[in-house]
Regions:
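Conformational coupling and interaction surfaces
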Residues: 2-6, 25-26, 33-34, 174-177, ...
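Active-site histidine-anchored catalytic micro-motif
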Residues: 3-13, 17-55, 95-201
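Metal-dependent C-N hydrolase catalytic cores
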Residues: 7, 50-119, 297-310, 316-320
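Short, glycine/acidic-enriched capping/hinge loops at junctions between secondary-structure elements
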Residues: 21-23, 48-49, 77-79, 281-283, ...
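Short secondary-structure boundary/hinge segments and terminal tails
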Residues: 44-45, 74-77, 204-205
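A residue-level signal for conserved active-site and pocket-lining positions in enzyme catalytic cores
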Residues: 66, 186, 252
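Short, well-ordered secondary-structure micro-motifs
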Residues: 77-79, 163-165, 206-208
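Short, surface-exposed amphipathic charged segments that create phosphate/polyanion-binding patches used
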Residues: 80-87, 166-170, 211
Length: 323
């Protein structure tokens, strides 16, 4: 397939173990072309996530510019990075990026996002698997990009459609909770958004045996095995899961296999203060209430359920194909 026929993707990310899984999944997709990798705080500080993105793209031969982005939320204070999940270095503390030092491409992620979208109207999908600060900043820089983007696909939110609520708090998913004001800005902008939240991603489990089989199949699988030993152990202890959830991979899978997802349509708002800060709430189309904060905002799509086994199989097929 010629590059001009491929779907262009800006991957907004905070690598992150499952971010690394998603990036390698994207590399394996012949119908996609990465236009940029943009980084943000989240699983680690922006300096660390940027280094990790540069390391991953160089190690696995992914020819794409990496642009560093926001280092803190729009309004609230930055919370501590979850080193207990992803390690101090964001990639499992196995020493993968030790002594690695490469500078990102020039320019702020939000500015480059705007430029790429304006240069390719109707062709660019933003895949955001991190706090949504870069996207909110891009909208502030040029609101006109909302009418030019093809789609915005988010790994974020917890809407309770699948019985799952938060992982950062009892009601808030981590990416949205890290910058709730940015998330509300993104969900209320007049552009297409599809959210693949914990309702789906927490059911997409690559088992220990899946990871072991991929590790025996080539460098990509072995690398993912190495960085995810502590990650997998955390899932076992905290969630009683034999393996780990493919949060970011599930959102990436939507780009190439949307038929695996059942979507619900309706306006989405995010709580930006109080005990429920970071909670994402969808008002379904056709449900009639009195005047509310959802009024006047365009509908967004939220995944309520999916073919979980199909998503896991797509991931395994992708990683095996990389050798």
């Amino acid at each position: 397939m010629a590059d001009t026929e491929k779907n262009l993707v800006i991957f907004d990310t905070d690598p992150g173990i499952d971010d690394a899984m998603a990036l390698l999944f994207l590399k394996a997709q012949p119908s996609l072309k990465l236009a940029a990798v943009t980084t943000v705080f989240g699983n680690a500080e922006t300096e660390v996530t940027t280094r990790n993105a540069l390391y991953l793209t160089q190690r696995f031969g992914i020819d794409v510019p990496v642009y560093a982005g926001a280092t803190r939320p729009l309004t609230i204070e930055r919370g501590p990075a979850p080193a207990f999940i992803h390690g101090e270095d964001g990639l499992g503390d196995v020493g993968a990026t030790q002594s690695f030092a490469v500078r990102p491409a020039e320019g702020h992620a939000a500015d480059r996002m705007v430029e790429i979208i304006k240069a390719n109207p109707g062709r660019v999908t933003i895949l955001a698997v991190a706090p949504l600060t870069n996207l909110a900043l891009a909208l502030d820089r040029d609101p006109g990009i909302a009418s030019l983007v093809k789609d915005v696909v988010i790994m974020g939110g917890a809407f309770a459609w699948g019985g799952r609520r938060g992982n950062a708090t009892p009601v808030a998913e981590a990416n949205v909770h890290n910058d709730p004001h940015a998330a509300d800005r993104v969900f209320t902008a007049d552009w297409p958004v599809t959210a693949i939240g914990l309702d789906v991603t927490s059911h997409c489990v690559a088992t220990h045996d899946d990871a072991a089989q991929l590790a025996s199949g080539g460098e990509a699988g072995r690398f993912l095995w190495d960085i995810s030993r502590g990650y997998e152990d955390l899932y076992r202890r905290r969630n009683q899961v034999d393996g780990c959830c493919l949060h970011d991979v599930a959102a990436a899978a939507y780009l190439v296999a949307p038929e695996l997802f059942a979507l619900r349509s309706g306006a989405v708002r995010v709580v930006t203060e109080g005990i429920a800060i970071g909670q994402s709430i969808q008002k379904l189309d056709g449900h009639i209430f009195g005047p509310s904060a959802w009024d006047g905002h365009s509908s967004k799509l939220v995944a309520g359920e999916a073919d979980y086994a199909g998503i896991v199989e797509a991931y395994k097929t992708a990683i095996r194909s990389l050798g």
